[in-house]
Amino acid sequence: MSGNTIGKLFTVTTFGESHGPALGAIVDGCPPGLALSEADLQRDLDRRRPGTSKFTTQRKEPDQVRILSGVFEGRTTGTPIGLLIENTDQRSKDYAEIARRFRPGHADYTYLQKYGIRDYRGGGRSSARETAMRVAAGGIARKYLRERLGVTVQGCLTQLGPIELGIKDWMAVDDNPFFCADPERVPDLESFMQDLRKAGNSIGAAVTVVARGCPPGLGEPVFDRLDADLAHALMSINAVKGVELGAGFASVMQHGSEHRDELTPEGFASNNAGGVLGGLSTGQDVVTRIALKPTSSIVVPGRTIDTEGEPVPVVTKGRHDPCVGIRAVPIAEAMVALTLMDHWLRHRAQCADVQPETPPIPAANR
């Protein structure tokens, strides 16, 4: 299997399966001298960790990360950073019934068609369990971006099923189990999710991630545009079915006179571009939004076929998220941070000496 590495200069390779003994990652290209400890990575892992609320999967994993290499006396050495998280709460017996039948909406069928073999225990490599390592690796990128460049990356839930959510208070995001920046709507979310659980069903969601403080010029046209690489990174997250930057699909309804982000001596007048023009960052907030499908791991009976091609019923057992979008917030943050980190190193390698005659202009008022 290839395709397990992301990045050009700041690379992350992950390994491991949902019910294997452990998950791991190799982070290569991190500059030396960055103060780094396991505690620096644990905060975001705890935000993603399963079993932290009644609205997510009840699989109990401590997700304690270990740094195996690349750090000496509390600082990165410039060598590959090895990360490891042990799996401790596998219940593989829950998946015995699907060993020879395909769950609709999952990768069971496609993995078997491609490889001729599949790990049916919790989806194996295709499980979102793999994203724990992305969050750990993303913690390294986030720390570097924040401390060396002043770049911050923050996400929140902006829609859960029919409930649209505003971004009213970023400080409230970590104070509720939904990563919601619209705290007045939290009771509505709780009520909706309780009804959903009773029905044994699932729901989709949307997550918005905003990166602030990005310097202008990040991106490599034409095929490694910043927006293209952000879309690539975000689409690699399990269950993501769509990615927007800035106004996104709403651009279809805008006139050019509205959509263009006019430049003034005081700064950009708007940010419909989402902080990227011509594949390069503008210095404005980089604003991304992802749509996540509802998981098909539900107890509502459905139809499928077995490995012999015969029709069989399917009811998913095991422990699953009724809305995968909730725990996707720290995952999406990590993927944005990893992309920005890689592009910063690439920009620095080629354009460190560039001094444009026009200084950067301020971002639009948020």
Curated annotation (Swiss-Prot):
- InterPro entries in the record, alphabetically? Chorismate_synth, Chorismate_synth_AroC_sf, Chorismate_synthase_CS
Q: Which PROSITE patterns match?
A: CHORISMATE_SYNTHASE_1, CHORISMATE_SYNTHASE_3
Specify which residues bind FMN according to the UniProt entry for this protein.
R125, S126, S127, N238, A239, G278, K293, P294, T295, S296, S297, R319
Q: What is this protein called?
A: Chorismate synthase
What does the entry list under GO cellular component? cytosol
Question: Under which EC number(s) is this enzyme classified?
Answer: 4.2.3.5
Reaction equations catalysed: 5-O-(1-carboxyvinyl)-3-phosphoshikimate = chorismate + phosphate
The gene from which this protein is expressed is aroC
PANTHER family, alphabetized: CHORISMATE SYNTHASE
Binding sites annotated in the UniProt record for NADP(+): R48
Q: Recite the UniProt cofactor note for this protein.
A: Reduced FMN (FMNH(2)).
Please list the cofactors this protein needs.
Answer: FMNH2
Q: Which GO terms describe its biological process?
A: amino acid biosynthetic process; aromatic amino acid family biosynthetic process; chorismate biosynthetic process
Give the protein family: Belongs to the chorismate synthase family.
Kindly state the subunit structure of this protein: Homotetramer.
Q: Which NCBIfam families match?
A: aroC, PRK05382.1
Q: Name one GO molecular function term.
A: FMN binding
The top EC class, named as a word, is lyase
Pathway per its UniProt entry is: Metabolic intermediate biosynthesis; chorismate biosynthesis; chorismate from D-erythrose 4-phosphate and phosphoenolpyruvate: step 7/7
Functionally, this protein is described as follows: This reaction introduces a second double bond into the aromatic ring system.
Record keywords, A-Z: Amino-acid biosynthesis, Aromatic amino acid biosynthesis, FAD, Flavoprotein, FMN, Lyase, NADP
